[in-house]
Structures are given as structure tokens and as C-alpha cells.
């Protein structure tokens, strides 16, 4: 199973969980049983959160941390779903192991820009969302960018670990800097067109990059945009998109109650400012 398929299953699980944990747990458990080796740390975390009772939750965490040597960001193991385990000695031991592994990962983690040299006329830079990585971004965007050779697909991976094998972005004044630096570094490499695509938190990093640095691209594609930059810098974002003459495209699920309002907000103000902007949802 491809990682993107696991992500799709987890998204479906979240939707089912809104109606009830037992149904969501059974759905995910059935999917896992079909191909156990195809699922990673995030699936085990979901199963632990959705499990019926602390014993079952602990079993999934033990399998993830003790048997598979995975780890999680400390905050996620402090979730309310694990309240019944907060004083459990076995749980605290597993959490301590996970926390130590997380600290070790943070100490040596650096941002990764996949670009090595110009290999096509056009460049597409993909920015992953939280609990993802550069490989996931490449797999998600490759079907859209295509493999005809017209576009060179590259990625930027955050320096901030989220969990075992995954990374995250922070909505602050520094997390976006690798994205900005990556865009700036290829602006004068002779590409005919440079496009950037982000998913969820990756969209916010792209907007921060073009707003707070000289970074520029011809096209910004924002998929399911979670963009808290709008809370304090909406006017700056609109001004920069207009001044730098960048085309803006939004894609979002019609039932996405978190991201669609943000997409509509930025679409409205950029459209009013005369920017080349498109919003599609389904």
C-alpha cells in the first residue's frame, strides 16, 4: 500500500469517528488486518486512541514503541484519549522511551531540499503537511505534475520531527525559512515557470515564504489550506501576491470545515484586489 493510501484511510477513519469511535476503530482495524506491514506509526496511534479501553490502547502503543521502535511527539501521548493511562506504569515507561527517541531525533534533524540541478524547463516545488514528509509530498503531487518531463518535481522537508518518519511545520517566524530559502535558491536557475504546491500546513509555509522573504513563484497551488497567517497578516499576503504577480489556486473539500473557510477568505480578498485566483471545491 502506498503511503497516500494509508493517509486516505486515516482521513476516512476520522470522518467515521465523528459518528462514533467503535465504528471507526473497526473500520481501521479491518484495513490494517488486510495488510499489516503497509501501515505505520500514525495508524497505530489512531488505533490506540480509538481502542475500547486502556488495555487495548496500551497494547497498540506497546506494539508501536516497544516492538517496532517507533516514537511520537511528546504532546500526542498526552492526548485526552489516553487519560485513563496517565498514571499507568507501563504507559509512562513507553512514553519515556518515546520521548527520549523524539529528543534524539530533534537534536540531529535538519531541513531537506531535494533539488540538485536543473533537469526540466519548469519546476514544481511540493511542500508537505504535518505528519507527512518529503516522500509523501512527492507521491501526492506526482500524479498532478505528471511524468512527461516538462516539469521537474522537487520537495522541501521540514526540520521539525512530528513522529517517527514524519515532520511538521510551526506557524511562527522561523519554520517557513527553509521553504523561502529553497525557492530563492532556484529563482535564477533559468526555469521557464516555477510553481509551488502545498498541502494543509504546507500552504501556510508557502504564503509565509513569499510574504516575508524575496521568494517568488509564478503559481501557488494550495490544497486543503490551513493558513493561520491570515489571522495577523492577511493584508500583507494580498499585497505581496498582487505585487509579485503570482497566480493563486485553491482546492478544498466541500465539507472541510477547517480549511474551506480560510480558502474562501483569502480567495475573496485576493479576487477583490484583482489577483489571478481560482477556488475549486468538491
Question: Model-flagged regions — what are they?
Answer:
Residues 208-212:
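Active-site signature of alpha/beta-hydrolase-fold catalytic machinery across serine-
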Residues 227-282:
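The feature captures the conserved acid-bearing segment of alpha/beta-hydrolase catalytic domains
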Residues 122-190:
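Serine-hydrolase catalytic machinery in alpha/beta-hydrolase-like enzymes
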Residues 107-121:
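Short beta-strand-to-loop junctions in surface cap/lid or active-site-entrance loops
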Residues 215-228:
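A conserved short beta-strand
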Residues 198-206:
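Gly/Ala-rich beta-loop-alpha elbow adjacent to hydrolase catalytic centers
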Residues 196-198, 223:
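Short beta-strand immediately N-terminal to the catalytic nucleophile in serine-hydrolase-like folds
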Residues 2-97:
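Alpha-helical protein-protein interaction scaffolds
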Amino acid at each position: 500500500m502506498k503511503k497516500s493510501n494509508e493517509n486516505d484511510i486515516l482521513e476516512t477513519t476520522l470522518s467515521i469517528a465523528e459518528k462514533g469511535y467503535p465504528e471507526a476503530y473497526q473500520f481501521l482495524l479491518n484495513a490494517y488486518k488486510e495488510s499489516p506491514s503497509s501501515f505505520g506509526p500514525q495508524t497505530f496511534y489512531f488505533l490506540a486512541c480509538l481502542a475500547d479501553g486502556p488495555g487495548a490502547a496500551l497494547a497498540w502503543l506497546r506494539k508501536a514503541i516497544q516492538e517496532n521502535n517507533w516514537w511520537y511527539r511528546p504532546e500526542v501521548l498526552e492526548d485526552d484519549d489516553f487519560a485513563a493511562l496517565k498514571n499507568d506504569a507501563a504507559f509512562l515507561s513507553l512514553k519515556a522511551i518515546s520521548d527520549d527517541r523524539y529528543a534524539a531525533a530533534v537534536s540531529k534533524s535538519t531541513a531537506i531540499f531535494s533539488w540538485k540541478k536543473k533537469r526540466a524547463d519548469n519546476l514544481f516545488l511540493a511542500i508537505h503537511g504535518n505528519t507527512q514528509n518529503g516522500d509523501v509530498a512527492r507521491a501526492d503531487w506526482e500524479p498532478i505534475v505528471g511524468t512527461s518531463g516538462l516539469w521537474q518535481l522537487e520537495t522541501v522537508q521540514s526540520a521539525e520531527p512530528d513522529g517517527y518518519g514524519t515532520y511538521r511545520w510551526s506557524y511562527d517566524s522561523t519554520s517557513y525559512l527553509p521553504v523561502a530559502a529553497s525557492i530563492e535558491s532556484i529563482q535564477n536557475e533559468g526555469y521557464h515557470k516555477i510553481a509551488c504546491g502545498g498541502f494543509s500546513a504546507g500552504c501556510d509555509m508557502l504564503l509565509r515564504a513569499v510574504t516575508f522573504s524575496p521568494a517568488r513563484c509564478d503559481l501557488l497551488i494550495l490544497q486543503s489550506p490551513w493558513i493561520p497567517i491570515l489571522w495577523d497578516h492577511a493584508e500583507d499576503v494580498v499585497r505581496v501576491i498582487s505585487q509579485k504577480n503570482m497566480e493563486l489556486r485553491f482546492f478544498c473539500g466541500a465539507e472541510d470545515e477547517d480549511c474551506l473557510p480560510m480558502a474562501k477568505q483569502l480567495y475573496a480578498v485576493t479576487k477583490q484586489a484583482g489577483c489571478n485566483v481560482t477556488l475549486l471545491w468538491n
